[in-house]
Amino acid sequence: MTSYIGDLKPGDKLMFKGPIPKFPYKSNQFEEIGMIAGGTGITPMWQLIDHIASDKNDKTKVTLLYSNKTEEDILLREKFDELKKDPRFNIVYFLDKAPKNWQGETGFISKEAVDKYLPKAEAGEKAHIFVCGPPPQVKSIAGPKVAGQQGEIGGVLKELGFKSEQVFK
């Protein structure tokens, strides 16, 4: 997408669509939400996080596992760091190339990290997991997403016992 936009010339037309709501969230719909995002996959997560944060009556606990290559790549960092002050939110950063003084997690988001930080599959309807990121990450965590469809549950989340109805990718 970025290279396409970069190749545009003055006067070229660019069509946008959206926003297109894909998950109709209701306040307090879940007790806990787990989110796994990679890179620009943070965009839909931010929309839901911002919605929950702006509703003080929404008691949903949200944990975000957010992976990037470098610390400079973390989008919305100031907003997420501010949200850490709200007890409803837990934000955990993962970096592939972490600086020496890095306090967050390193490497890819693993099965162990998902199990450590996110709600458990046994929570059933009380918890929900959202996944958005590069296709290899989504496939590894939740199984492949089919164009316009969720696709079957797979990857780490299936190994941890999650069912399709508990996951949105």
What are these regions (language model features)?
Residues G11-L14, M45, F80, F130:
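Hydrophobic structural packing positions in well-ordered secondary structure
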Residues K22, L48-D55, E82, K116-K120:
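A generic secondary-structure signal
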Residues T40-M45, Q137:
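Hydrophobic/small residue at the entry helix of a nucleotide-binding pocket
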